[in-house]
Amino acid sequence: MITSELFGTAPCGTPVHRYTLNGPEICVRIMDYGATVLGIDVPDIPGNVRDVVLGFDKLEDYFDNPACFGATIGPVANRTAGATITIDGTDWHMPANEGANNLHSDLEHGLHKRVWDVELDEVHNAVRMTTSLEDGELGLPGNRTFTAVFTVTRTGVFRIEHGCESDRATYVSMTNHTYFNLAGHNAGMDCEHFFVANAAHYLPINEQNIPTGEIAPVEGTPFDFRELRPVAPGMEADDPQIKQARGYDHCLCIDGYQYGRNLRRAMHVEEMWTGRELDYYTTAPGVQLYTGNWLGDEHAKDDANYGWGAGFALEAEMYPDTPHQPLFPQGIVGPGHPYSNVIEYHFMRH
């Protein structure tokens, strides 16, 4: 069953609605402003239900949301060197919003700043959201139609399906930017997360947090999560990559990528105090692991104060700066070649 209610009004004057999807041992709240995940309620071992998603109580706080809590990011997630992408011999320019580089397309006018059109699918317990960009809008070519479909399945799996169609060649790499704390969104560092990542390689970054182009083995580094290990020690490791980002803000190269055709488990997360667990699946080649290294919001939901490390984001996407790295899996889409990315969240308690 899907319920909807008025959540407020966007700066453009368009009404914003909040939608609730329920399933076995899960309740998901989303809104059409930014196709944003607002909250996910799941139980711990004794059955105590908590919201495990960081965010705000009020719509107005999402208008100034530099952390991009819960947002659908696009058309290009993550960082692009020089804020420029070359497509078919033409240079296309996005805003230089992080020094000379681009982060998340356009932090002021990106997809997370729009009110999306909505279609409810009661049969599949899904909310389908759609928005469009004209040719050249946000600095990239193509008349583009973007979709984000949010589904809670009969087995309690939360699925997000991203898609894009364009009438000319363009570059697309969408993701969802939800932050989690499996001990509860306001638990802060009073938690103990352990990770497993199906990733034998990661992408080192330079002093501007742009991938160097190397696809490096994780063995012997803080990025080796091939076996269950706590994330907190790695966030403060004496490692130049960790120091550069103040924690983890790196792309893990998920094993078994087959050009978006295979959904596979990328990450497994356990919170030891509550017994909540998360299996994270995707069809994307990489997952940006971000450990909230720059969080610091005093206006969060339930009067929470999210500081450094208060939550982690798993961002399934094309590798950062792919247009400048020919050895990376590429993300050019166009007529007859639509973009798609599937993300699934499987919550458990053990």
Question: Where do the model's predicted regions map?
Answer:
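An exposed, glycine/acidic-rich loop-and-rim segment of catalytic or binding clefts
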Residues: 1-350
